[in-house]
Curated annotation (Swiss-Prot):
CDD domains: GluRS_core (cd00808). One of its GO terms (cellular component) is cytosol. Catalyzes the attachment of glutamate to tRNA(Glu) in a two-step reaction: glutamate is first activated by ATP to form Glu-AMP and then transferred to the acceptor end of tRNA(Glu). Its main location: cytoplasm. Disulfide bonds: none annotated. The lineage of its organism: Bacteria, Pseudomonadati, Pseudomonadota, Gammaproteobacteria, Enterobacterales. One of its GO terms (biological process) is glutamyl-tRNA aminoacylation. This is Glutamate--tRNA ligase.
Length: 471
């Protein structure tokens, strides 16, 4: 049997982390089994579905490289198919027209609530032979079995049973003639030959209704796996406050797709004590049997730790391709500074995100207007004038501009003056970066370049001279 899974988001908002994890699990299960992965857009909610949301879903899937083999299919383009099946069900008696008014249904609901009963349709129009005009408003309901139970073996949670008496006759076509979500899903899974439905636990209550419709149609019933929800680190429902933002916001915030995928796969699944997984390892090891039944807690610090790992362990050239977007957003012209791959090597250890890297690299490409006040007050004092003058002289004399030769110039200055490296290195760092923190001063000066470094030292010496006149 060919394994076939699907990811079927509703385009009423962005692709959030819960949806992305569901997509990842469905994708990994298919890839692990050499199966196929289908993308389906469930856009039956015409009022809330938007093109912007569809675009956001596509962007998120593409950024995460969760490629699909079929689709994207759109439910709004399949209404003729759904209605044809409903008409067939009306003919063979597995569905019926319901003419109950909104007022009757509201009164029924109130009566049931007063008695403490679960609100459900009472089957008033089931088997009715009353004559109605063709144009009289009505819905179509599925004739749900009234005896027995629906039992399915959830691949994550084990056997789950629902009594058919607890399930009312589901509306499958609205008064306006449009098919409903639960029905469209069933026909799609049947037509697309989906073998495994992996989705959030909020769909568990839909499953027995969908199974009954499939059985009434004589269609094969797929296997189901319902993934637990994601909570915030405080145990409450995940919200924006915890980091529940769209997938592309993680891109904007400077995360690598590998880091987010690694984080999401571990958010409910494990393989021993291993924490770091490449995409190939995920595909090789993933199993629904190892997915947790309990809810998982979202932890931004763990995601940042993974991102820092990938920034420093993926090839710098690859990381640079993702960094370039953030550099563009920062408005930096990188033609007169170090290659971005070199920048990754310089700043990787210091930065948890690519956005942080882009924000902290400006001095490599642009001259700064003024020195950081605290750093200048501490390190650009009159006592720093002699070390800066001497190290400038040595840097200007370098004919082969390498980090090693720059290091020798700094060390030589310190030795010549009988001072520690810090007495030379710190004023030099502030002089060339404008700040008190940077990667190693030798590699920083090398990346900034010879002429730009010398000009900035001159600026620092002028700053010190002005400071001396004010004393």
């Amino acid at each position: 049997m060919k394994i076939k899974t699907r990811f079927a988001p509703s385009p009423t908002g962005y692709l959030h982390v819960g949806g992305a994890r569901t997509a990842l699990y469905s994708w990994l299960f298919a890839r692990h089994q050499d199966g196929e992965f289908v993308l389906r857009i469930e856009d039956t909610d015409l009022e809330r579905s938007t093109q912007d949301a569809i675009d956001a879903i596509m962007d998120g899937m593409n950024w995460l490289s969760l490629n699909w083999d079929e689709g994207p299919y759109y439910q709004t383009k399949r209404f003729d198919r759904y209605n044809a099946v409903i008409d067939q069900m009306l003919e063979n008696g597995t569905a019926y027209k319901c003419y109950c008014s909104k007022e009757r249904l509201e009164a029924l609901r109130e009566q049931q609530m007063e008695k403490g009963d679960k609100p459900r349709y009472d089957g008033h129009c089931r088997g009715s032979h009353e004559h109605h005009a063709d144009n009289e408003p009505h819905v179509v309901r599925f004739l749900n079995p009234q005896e027995g139970s629906v039992i399915f073996n959830d691949r994550i949670r084990g056997p789950i049973e629902f009594s058919n008496q607890e399930l009312d006759d589901l509306i499958i076509r609205r008064t306006d003639g449009s098919p409903t979500y639960n029905f469209c899903v069933v026909i799609d899974d049947w037509d697309m030959e989906i073998t495994h439905v992996i989705r959030g636990e909020d769909h568990i209550n839909n499953t027995p209704r969908q199974i009954n419709i499939l059985k009434a149609l004589g269609a094969p019933v797929p296997e189901y796996a319902h993934v637990s929800m994601i909570l915030g680190d405080d145990g409450k429902k995940l919200s924006k406050r915890h980091g529940a933002v769209g997938v592309m916001q993680y891109r904007d915030d400077g995360y690598l797709p590998e880091a987010l995928l690694n984080y999401l796969v571990r958010l409910g699944w494990s393989s021993g004590d291993q924490e770091i997984f490449s995409i190939d390892e995920m595909k090789s090891l993933f199993s629904l049997d190892a997915v947790n039944k309990s809810a998982s807690a979202f932890n931004t610090e763990k995601l940042q730790w993974l991102n820092h790992h990938y920034i420093n362990h993926l090839p710098a050239e690859y990381v640079a391709t993702h960094l370039s977007w953030h550099i563009e957003q920062a408005g930096l012209d990188t033609r007169t500074g170090p290659q971005l791959s070199e920048l990754v090597g310089l700043l990787g250890e210091r930065c948890k995100t690519l956005k942080e890297m882009a924000d902290s690299c400006r001095y490599f490409y642009e001259d700064f207007a003024e020195f950081d006040a605290d750093a200048a007050k501490k390190h650009l004092r009159p006592v720093a004038r002699q070390p800066l003058e001497l190290v400038r002289e040595k840097l200007a004399a370098i004919t082969s501009w390498t980090a090693e030769n720059i290091h020798h110039a700094i060390q030589g200055t310190a030795d010549e003056l009988g001072q520690g490296m810090g007495k030379v290195g710190m004023p030099l760092r502030v002089a060339v970066t404008g700040a008190g923190q940077s990667p190693g001063v030798d590699v920083t000066v090398h990346a900034i370049g010879q002429q730009r470094s010398l000009a900035r030292i001159d600026k620092a010496l002028a700053f010190i001279a002005e400071r001396e006149t004010q004393q």
